[in-house]
Amino acid sequence: MIELTVAQIAEIVGGAVADISPQDAAHRRVTGTVEFDSRAIGPGGLFLALPGARADGHDHAASAVAAGAAVVLAARPVGVPAIVVPPVAAPNVLAGVLEHDNDGSGAAVLAALAKLATAVAAQLVAGGLTIIGITGSSGKTSTKDLMAAVLAPLGEVVAPPGSFNNELGHPWTVLRATRRTDYLILEMAARHHGNIAALAEIAPPSIGVVLNVGTAHLGEFGSREVIAQTKAELPQAVPHSGAVVLNADDPAVAAMAKLTAARVVRVSRDNTGDVWAGPVSLDELARPRFTLHAHDAQAEVRLGVCGDHQVTNALCAAAVALECGASVEQVAAALTAAPPVSRHRMQVTTRGDGVTVIDDAYNANPDSMRAGLQALAWIAHQPEATRRSWAVLGEMAELGEDAIAEHDRIGRLAVRLDVSRLVVVGTGRSISAMHHGAVLEGAWGSGEATADHGADRTAVNVADGDAALALLRAELRPGDVVLVKASNAAGLGAVADALVADDTCGSVRP
């Protein structure tokens, strides 16, 4: 964050200083980072007093200041230097922090944080900062990681860790930028119409990227049409002097070209795009290979990330880098060198015993679940050797009235892709639908051996991650391939971590 005095921050957010004199507030400076975890605070930092599931940040204000925080942003006096903003009604937002906001204190601090980030972003843009916004139903984090890699040779990049993409993570990421930052990459998530427009007001992007319109959070939106309207808030927010990168292979995204005043850059897997990929092939770990075409030039790309769906993500990252002045050759080299970054997102690890773990446990929706299963099937069914495959799948959250049908489709898809073992983790109607869909599609749920399917080719439903892990530990064989995927709330990341940690021979991450 740029250096500001306590008094300056108070003026920006409309707060009053407490437990610090006006004279001291005019001289005390915030020189460190903004944090909402008191354990992460450092010298000169700004601590956000937010309510949580187990504790209220207001109760940890003193420890944050003792750890070096210059001041606390709070909704009430906390006995140490603070900027106090009055409680407000919680807006319709994503941030889980407001789930435990019983008195409006969390909403107040969050609103003040947005004001501070807005002011800082405006100063940095005036100094030459380029802000890039990314949205889409899936692929935002993977694209963000690739984009950070291709922009790094051009200047200093700030991007969110993991999926910090809501009303808390978005301004928090903005405030990581300094006067040395050249490129600020921001993910923009939504669960309601207007969410992306609100995020874009905090840090107006000069480049916007729309990846896809799928069915993630369908239960919250109500229809795919509303999802498309919400994603379109990003290209509508980009000014005429900016650029909007659209995935032309998704009709709902391609239609957004009519909704923006900015210049449109289309990416595609064929030559109809301004930036496009030549014939795509996959290696033995489902890592894409293709020729990148743009600006009458071309270069070979060998991605280090897993899954055919990563091609579109890479093309969007490439289009942004090209807009920022990189050459096609520079972009191809950076994409090829980019490793997987964010945890639990298509991380492929091969253990010393030959078991390959595909950890995509951070999140799941129907589109990303299909992509994960297709990658699993590709890795398991190589011409040189067919390997036994496991799909360990949990619930896809927030699908509303389509939840039963979508889970049923995923169970059936596992059978059609010839997955050897489907382990459905959890309880409830959606989980049952996934299991029953697999059984009905292939009649392989009983575990009975037939001429075509051995006794190990079954679909099973287990209660939780511990039960899934026990089953895997008992039955995995050297050379098996395991996909672990679910919405984050299912907690299957711990299963993937344990499978990798079980390796006693030394694992390899490609």
Swiss-Prot record:
One of its GO terms (biological process) is cell wall organization. ATP binds at G136, S137, S138, G139, K140, T141, S142. Signal peptide: none annotated. Involved in cell wall formation. Catalyzes the final step in the synthesis of UDP-N-acetylmuramoyl-pentapeptide, the precursor of murein. Pathway: Cell wall biogenesis; peptidoglycan biosynthesis. This is UDP-N-acetylmuramoyl-tripeptide--D-alanyl-D-alanine ligase. InterPro entries: Mur-like_cat_sf, Mur_ligase_C, Mur_ligase_C_dom_sf, Mur_ligase_cen, Mur_ligase_N, MurCDEF_CellWall_CoF430Synth, MurE/MurF_N, UDP-N-AcMur_synth. It is found in: Cytoplasm. The keyword Nucleotide-binding applies. The keyword Iron-sulfur does not apply. The gene is murF. It comes from the Bacteria. Its EC number is 6.3.2.10. One of its GO terms (molecular function) is ATP binding. One of its GO terms (cellular component) is cytoplasm. Belongs to the MurCDEF family. MurF subfamily. Was identified as a high-confidence drug target. Keywords: ATP-binding, Cell cycle, Cell division, Cell shape, Cell wall biogenesis/degradation, Cytoplasm, Ligase, Nucleotide-binding, Peptidoglycan synthesis. It catalyses: D-alanyl-D-alanine + UDP-N-acetyl-alpha-D-muramoyl-L-alanyl-gamma-D-glutamyl-meso-2,6-diaminopimelate + ATP = UDP-N-acetyl-alpha-D-muramoyl-L-alanyl-gamma-D-glutamyl-meso-2,6-diaminopimeloyl-D-alanyl-D-alanine + ADP + phosphate + H(+).
